[in-house]
Design a protein with these regions (language model features):
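Extended, histidine- and acidic-residue-enriched regions that form the cofactor-binding/catalytic faces
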Residues: 1-15, 20-161
Length: 161
């Protein structure tokens, strides 16, 4: 929120926040709501990297709904930061998604035997390069669209309708 305040005070009227970690979404959304209430002319977007577009979302979720270190994430890391990938562990690391019928959200250590949910064994550097290119292309399109967007209706934040 403080960064958003600074961005607004610097004269910017649009802020695009790209979230790349699933548990950061809730506090980022709270910051968006506070910024919107405080700065009427400030437009803030929180964009989750795994849901930038339909094709990006399909790649992230194809092997698990509650994924963690799965095919998509492992492929991305193989492409952009290969030194952080322990390739010798990949073939043995697949772990099923155990959250299908859960009512509550559980931490990874209660849903995975090894910190993985999904199939990192399917990962490759080539898939990661393709996915990263899609993410850049699709996010760029969102930002270009957002740079032109105006509110659908002209009401001030605190104005009653």
């Amino acid at each position: 929120k403080e960064i958003g305040d600074w961005v607004h005070a610097s004269g910017f009227r649009r802020l695009f926040i790209i979230n790349t970690h699933v548990t950061n979404f809730a506090p980022l959304r709270c910051a968006l709501e506070m910024l919107r209430a405080e700065h009427d002319s400030f437009m803030v977007a929180v964009i989750n990297s795994a849901s930038i577009s339909q094709r990006v979302r399909e790649q992230h979720f194809h092997d698990a709904d509650d994924w963690h270190a799965n095919d998509a994430e492992t492929s991305l890391m193989m492409a952009v930061s290969p030194s952080m990938v322990r390739e010798e562990l990949i073939a043995e690391s697949d772990d099923e998604d155990r959250t299908e019928n859960c009512v509550f959200s559980h931490p990874v250590n209660r849903t995975s035997t090894n910190g993985v949910t999904g199939k990192p064994s399917l990962a490759s550097r080539e898939k990661g390069e393709r996915l990263f290119a899609w993410m850049v292309e699709d996010l760029s399109a969102i930002v270009r669209r957002g740079m032109k967007e105006e509110s659908p209706l002209p009401h001030a934040y605190n104005e009653s309708i």
